[in-house]
Amino acid sequence: MTELTVNQPLNYRNTGFITSAPDIRHLPQDTGVEIAFAGRSNAGKSSALNRITDQKGLARTSKTPGRTQLINMFEVTQGCNLIDLPGYGFAQVPLELKIKWQKALGEYLQKRECLKGLVVLMDIRHPMKDLDQQMIFWAIESRLPVLVLLTKADKMKSGARKAQLLKVRESSKSFGGDVQIELFSSLKGIGLDQVRRKLDTWFGPELERQLMLAAAENGETYTGESLSDKSDD
């Protein structure tokens, strides 16, 4: 009997780069499940992706914030992709380019059908800037769940970061929608397991869909927990 399960956590160490695109029109086919990562240019987005996948060089970190202008796609497993969106809000980027990026980000959040969750990263010392809030509003308008990561949590002492977490959680209630706030540190691994569990939850329906297709192709019955061969009944 062949047994397949949807409950086992994904191995994010297997994540690999697929492609880069200047906008939504140049992305691969709109299928599977995508989880997007967004944040200001100095929020530590690339470092977070590298820590989540346990790969130091997966997402390129730049010493010049605002340099990454492309949408970068990474595959965790078939049909499950992580999307690294261009950083926003860096002062030295020309206004015309800022407007172009913001338009591309809004278009992606509102029109990409396979997008099923948004991770917004914010420096814990400077959370909820105007553009951060705009990203969350766009997601809510598109009925997307949002995970806000207060990055660089190691920069604050334990008591101070807990107080900041509670403060941001309280202020986020005004958004409505599904918005979860958590602490995160790429350096210390704070919040790492929580992020991976959330990603597993968001990817779950796609993995279940694949199991159902595999069951049909192999003459098996999908029970919701595993696939059991009919011939063994």
Swiss-Prot record:
Cell cycle among keywords: yes
Q: Where is the EngB-type G domain?
A: 31-205
List required co-factors. Answer: Mg(2+)
> Please, one GO biological process term?
division septum assembly
* Keyword field: Cell cycle, Cell division, GTP-binding, Magnesium, Metal-binding, Nucleotide-binding, Septation
| A single GO molecular function term of this UniProt record | metal ion binding
Where along the chain is Mg(2+) bound?
A: 46, 68
GO cellular component, as recorded: cytosol
HAMAP family in UniProt? GTPase_EngB (MF_00321)
What is the role of the protein in this entry? Answer: Necessary for normal cell division and for the maintenance of normal septation.
Report the family membership: Belongs to the TRAFAC class TrmE-Era-EngA-EngB-Septin-like GTPase superfamily. EngB GTPase family.
Protein's name in the database: Probable GTP-binding protein EngB
Give the organism, scientific name: Photobacterium profundum (strain SS9)
